[in-house]
Curated annotation (Swiss-Prot):
The record marks Y177 as: Role in the phospholipid gating. It comes from Enterobacter lignolyticus (strain SCF1). Its EC number is 2.3.1.251. The keyword Acyltransferase applies. This is Lipid A acyltransferase PagP. GO terms for biological process: lipid A biosynthetic process. GO terms for cellular component: cell outer membrane. Residues 1-26 form the signal peptide.
Length: 191
């Protein structure tokens, strides 16, 4: 009798795990599907009905000093000369959506293009609605000289502070020792 109970318990445990796993999988699939739908709708709406056209001006790259040998720091470019163009809109929740194309001088002083989509949750904490803060992400594709200009996908965090049509946007490229760990910022002017 005791052996039968062990088998019954094992079967019940196995079946319940399978049921839970199937439910969790369905929930995860629905979440991914909803996220993809939201992203593609935001990109499409920004492309088809932009409120603004944007000028991008890269202003700084900074290599985290704790993550690099001094010799590398001394040889890196931290003035990312370049420019970019984009289109953007504020959605019904007041959040920023933008499509952009930018080219700038990378750490090795070689041209690096990037094209992508950015989204920021936007807060207007002051009585003056012109002042805004943002926190979000960017998805895009870049290409670098040291990777033979092979297209590389990027998913990066993004933050901003702005007043009216001028916004200081930034990201951080994570990495390992002597690779990545770069703060990159640019000015964005809306027209």
């Amino acid at each position: 009798m005791l052996k039968v109970n062990k088998y019954v318990i094992l079967i019940i445990a196995f079946v319940s795990q399978m049921m839970f796993s199937t439910t969790a999988q369905a929930s995860f699939s629905a979440t991914v599907s909803d996220a993809w739908s939201t992203l593609s709708n935001n990109v499409t709406q920004t492309w088809q009905a932009p409120e603004h056209y944007d000028l991008y001006v890269p202003v700084i790259t900074w290599h985290a000093r704790f993550a690099y040998d001094q010799e590398k720091i001394d040889n890196y470019n931290e003035r990312p000369w370049g420019a970019g163009f984009g289109m953007s809109r504020w959605d019904e929740k007041g959040n920023w959506n933008g499509l952009y194309l930018m080219a700038f001088k990378d750490s090795f002083n070689k041209w690096e293009p990037i094209v992508g989509y950015g989204w920021e949750k936007t807060w207007r904490p002051l009585a003056d609605d012109n002042f805004h803060l943002g926190l979000g992400y960017t998805l895009g594709v870049t290409a670098r000289d040291n990777w033979n200009y092979i297209p590389l996908p990027v998913i990066l965090p993004m933050a901003s502070v702005g007043y009216g049509p001028a916004t200081f946007q930034m990201t951080y490229i994570p990495g390992t020792y002597n690779n990545g760990n770069v703060y990159f910022a640019w000015l964005r002017f809306q027209f």
